[in-house]
């Protein structure tokens, strides 16, 4: 089984790296404000029709555009969900959502989290799924990519005060990156057997003679952008373990590839725009090392079996509880690490049923800030924060002013970096503490002891870091949990974007200094090790006490 696991990991890494390289070149053109071939005329007509000016923006204007679009989208989606019973494409006559669930869901999809306190097939109409959630899957992904576009320009431009035009970037990302790739993936899913229709739910008779109601809907179109945009919210409650969403082993492999495609391509694009492709490869090496180690740990833990079942005399040589038999332990373990490393949150297995160590790794990947590939855009700008921190630490050790790509990293940048890095740990630890101190928080726990605490910690970690997956043993559809997690999702998303954009505004005005004999190389194995160490150190110092009360205590008990 070890050989099978190694082959699976190696094949996955090879395929997504090969696919991401050409996409990275296309993204580099967009970052450099060079239209893709054959798109100039279409863009000119669209910009004119929409009244979009291509005048460049400073960081405050760029940030205002991103925030304005997302807040408007939140309001529209909130009222759409409240009044879905008045809207078309609702063959099951599903009622509108309660205010707290509508708020939680709207914030969830606008922030690219896709936390779901509901079952899609029994709660949302086709219109809400298609015009509400799927639209936000595109816009939230485009927003994250636009932010990293601005940050990359800040590192590569000299003595300027503008970072591009947010509206131009959003349109280009949506039209020329997300839409065509998502369309190809959706067509492939349909060919493989995923649903794509507007039929009412179908009553069928099973082979045992019982009646069953099969849900229908425009699934494939939402599934494609759900994975490509690292959104993760399922059309059905079972998410990607549902055969109508993920019908074959081939679609499952493509879903994993789609999750990592854009985050990897952005690393290639960064190196190309920076004029030193080694910089992008350095980031990919750091991410890949952490990723492979985490996959190996989860596979090992799940192959060992469930010790509690073994103690009861059951045959549990491997831990198949909560896993699809058509995917198995190894693929389920790989998918769990992919979806939590990349802030996607889609699942093909119940993470709540993983072993203590097997469930701790996905939780920890979220807690370090979703920087191991991470979400589209958000993963790379999150990792760039750790790059700046690593450069600062190295500068302290060698007694030089820290710099990255020739730009001095001053006190202002480091204060903003520290602020951005501390946002999500603060939300996770304070949110979990609040939940454990209140009756409303504890009443949602379906399990006692360390595992019950792990469910709470996982939920808040998932929300604050915009992942969206869950340990499902938590009854989170209550006003307390819907509001708490909505707050964590909103602040966890925009509380990081704001300082990142401020860092971009500060760096873009600086002039790059030529490298000297005392300049720390940021493209070699030494810096890769320093970056990995920085990520691990911050994660360990912040979350080891909380993890010790949850999965570690469960493992030792």
Swiss-Prot record:
UniProt function note: Part of the high-affinity ATP-driven potassium transport (or Kdp) system, which catalyzes the hydrolysis of ATP coupled with the electrogenic transport of potassium into the cytoplasm. This subunit binds the periplasmic potassium ions and delivers the ions to the membrane domain of KdpB through an intramembrane tunnel.
Subunit structure comment from the entry: The system is composed of three essential subunits: KdpA, KdpB and KdpC.
GO molecular function, one term: P-type potassium transmembrane transporter activity
This protein's UniProt keywords: Cell inner membrane, Cell membrane, Ion transport, Membrane, Potassium, Potassium transport, Transmembrane, Transmembrane helix, Transport
Family named by the database record: Belongs to the KdpA family.
Any one GO cellular component localisation term in the record: plasma membrane
A UniProt-annotated Pfam family: KdpA
Major localization class: membrane
Matches recorded under NCBIfam families: kdpA
Record's signal peptide: none
Superkingdom of source: Bacteria
Annotated TM spans: 5-25, 63-83, 132-152, 170-190, 253-273, 283-303, 329-349, 356-376, 379-399, 416-436, 484-504, 526-546
This protein's name: Potassium-transporting ATPase potassium-binding subunit
Subcellular location: Cell inner membrane
Membrane topology: Multi-pass membrane protein
């Amino acid at each position: 089984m070890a050989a099978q696991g190694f082959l699976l990991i190696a094949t996955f890494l090879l395929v997504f790296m090969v696919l991401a390289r050409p996409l990275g070149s296309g993204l580099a053109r967009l970052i450099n404000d060079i239209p893709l071939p054959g798109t100039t005329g279409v863009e000119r007509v669209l910009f004119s029709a929409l009244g979009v000016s291509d005048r460049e923006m400073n960081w405050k204007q760029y940030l205002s555009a991103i925030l304005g679009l997302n807040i408007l989208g939140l309001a529209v989606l909130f009222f759409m969900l409240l009044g879905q019973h008045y809207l078309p494409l609702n063959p099951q006559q599903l009622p509108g959502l309660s205010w707290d669930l509508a708020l939680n869901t709207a914030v969830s999809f606008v922030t690219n989290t896709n936390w779901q306190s509901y079952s899609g097939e029994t709660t949302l109409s086709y219109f809400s799924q298609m015009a509400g959630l799927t639209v936000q899957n595109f816009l939230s992904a485009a927003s994250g990519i636009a932010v990293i576009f601005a940050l990359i320009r800040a590192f590569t431009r000299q003595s300027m005060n503008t970072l591009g035009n947010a509206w131009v970037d959003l349109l280009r990302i949506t039209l020329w990156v997300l839409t065509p790739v998502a369309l190809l993936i959706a067509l492939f899913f349909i060919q493989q057997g995923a649903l794509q229709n507007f039929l009412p739910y179908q009553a069928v008779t099973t082979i045992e003679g019982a009646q069953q109601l099969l849900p229908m809907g425009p699934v494939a179109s939402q599934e494609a952008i759900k994975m490509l945009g690292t959104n993760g919210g399922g059309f059905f409650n079972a998410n990607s373990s549902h055969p109508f969403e993920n019908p074959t082993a081939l679609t499952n492999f493509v879903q994993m590839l789609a999750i990592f495609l854009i985050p990897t391509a952005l690393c290639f694009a960064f190196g190309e725009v920076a004029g030193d492709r080694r910089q992008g490869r350095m980031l990919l090496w750091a991410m890949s090392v952490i990723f492979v180690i985490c996959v190996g740990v989860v596979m090992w833990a799940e192959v060992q079996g469930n010790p509690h079942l073994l103690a009861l005399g059951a045959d549990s040589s491997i831990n198949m509880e909560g896993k699809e038999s058509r995917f198995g332990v190894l693929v389920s373990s790989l998918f769990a690490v992919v979806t939590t490393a990349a802030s996607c949150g889609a699942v093909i297995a119940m993470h709540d049923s993983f072993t203590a160590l097997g469930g701790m790794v996905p939780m920890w990947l979220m807690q370090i800030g979703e920087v191991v590939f991470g979400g589209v855009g958000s993963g790379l700008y999150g990792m760039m924060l750790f790059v700046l921190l690593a450069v600062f630490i190295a500068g302290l050790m060698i007694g030089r002013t820290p710099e990255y790509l020739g730009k001095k990293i001053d006190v202002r940048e480091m204060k903003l970096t520290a602020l951005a890095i501390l946002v999500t740990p603060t939300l996770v630890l304070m949110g979990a503490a609040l939940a454990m101190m209140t009756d409303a928080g504890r009443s949602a726990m379906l399990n006692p002891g360390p595992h019950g605490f792990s469910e709470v910690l996982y939920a808040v970690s998932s929300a604050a870091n915009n992942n969206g997956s869950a340990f499902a043993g938590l009854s989170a559809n209550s006003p307390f949990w819907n509001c708490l997690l909505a707050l964590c999702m909103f602040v966890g998303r925009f509380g990081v974007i704001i300082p990142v954009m401020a860092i971009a505004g500060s760096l873009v005005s600086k002039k790059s200094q030529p490298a000297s004999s005392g300049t720390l190389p940021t493209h070699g194995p030494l810096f890769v090790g320093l970056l990995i160490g920085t990520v691990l150190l911050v994660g360990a110092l912040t979350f080891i006490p909380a993890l010790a009360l949850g999965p570690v205590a469960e493992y030792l008990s």
